[in-house]
Swiss-Prot record:
Cofactor: Mg(2+)
Record-listed GTP binding positions: 12-18, 40-42, 304, 330-332, 412-414
Protein's UniProt name: Adenylosuccinate synthetase
Transmembrane feature ranges: none
Amino acid sequence: MPGIVLIGAQWGDEGKGKATDLIGTKVDYVARFNGGNNAGHTVVVGDESYALHLLPSGIISPTATPVIGNGVVVDPEVLLEEIEGLESRGIDCSRLLVSESAHVIAPYHRMIDKVTERFAGKKKIGTTGRGIGPAYADKINRVGIRIADLFHEDVLRDKVSNALHQKNQMLVKLYNRRAFDVEATVQELLEVGVKLKPYVANTSLILNNALDDGKTVLFEGGQATMLDIDHGTYPFVTSSNPTAGGACTGTGVGPTKIDRVIGVSKAYVTRVGEGPFPTELFDENGEWLRAQGHEYGVTTGRPRRCGWFDAVVNRYATQVNGLTDIVLTKLDVLTGLDEIPVCVAYDVNGVRYDDMPTDQSAFAAAKPIYGMMPGWSEDISQVHAFEDLPQTCQDYVKRLEELSGCRISAIGTGPQRDHIIEVHSLLD
């Protein structure tokens, strides 16, 4: 059975939680490989809605083992709160496995994230202020704390002391904030470590053994392609690699064990935070999409910026991820429009770009070149076969598939778990 990577093909919030839950009922492991609690996804099961931030979406499926890989940065308090919240609603979290090599978001990471963003002024990135970037920075600078360190008091104290020696000076002298007490920070981390210990494991070994034994593993990415630290709209990006390559480095599983890469795209586009967004709408159409799609961030509650489908972005996602399939979500949101614009290329200072400009100055200047598609008025939420969709709706999907350079294998037609059309099997 395969190793399957599921990633966002746009700027996030594409509906990966729903797609993961759909596939997760048929797989043995669901492994989160990047990011932290800056990523939010919602899974709807019947009348119940679950907003997840750090836990893999597969936690809702009773048959899958959820895994937090080494590429994730973990805020222990947030993780424990999320576990407690789900268990209070009857969800069994005892199956959860957390990599002992994952890095920890410490209290000082959150403070640094907030003050640096506040002082950035007009140059702010639009972070969630949850300490993700500073934790990854410590990881790269080799002064980070790993989950395994929470169980070795002397090691932990040494690492916290080393980190705070520099960070306290910055907080006090540059940002006029209070210094963190080393011992208080150590004790706080030790306490959460005790609670986390039952979940901690060598997840790389477990996942590799599972694949070798013929099990199916779903690798779940947080955020999305256009927020990738290397391939996204830098510097308005996240601090990790939400692209397909991150699935390997973020779990310790080699690329030869990946059989399928599925990208999730909305039938339109949204973005949260700062940064260029060529198809962004500033008129009543943008407000309409936001209202119809309930476009507010799961993690931040911020209203999302909305725009028409951008085929240049999707072609780029197909390229950098090696997509084999696309799950198209929220097609129902477009119901009622007479015409639907689709961005087929960019105009950059009079020059046509059919492909993504890697020069971010060019991308910031990109103006969308639209093709128009006829809309539909019928309710599609109860449609379960592609051929039963309105013809203009089918034509829209086929056009997006053609422009993206990748087949659309599943289509989301509403918020419920069963509001989806599986055109091609995502597991065969």
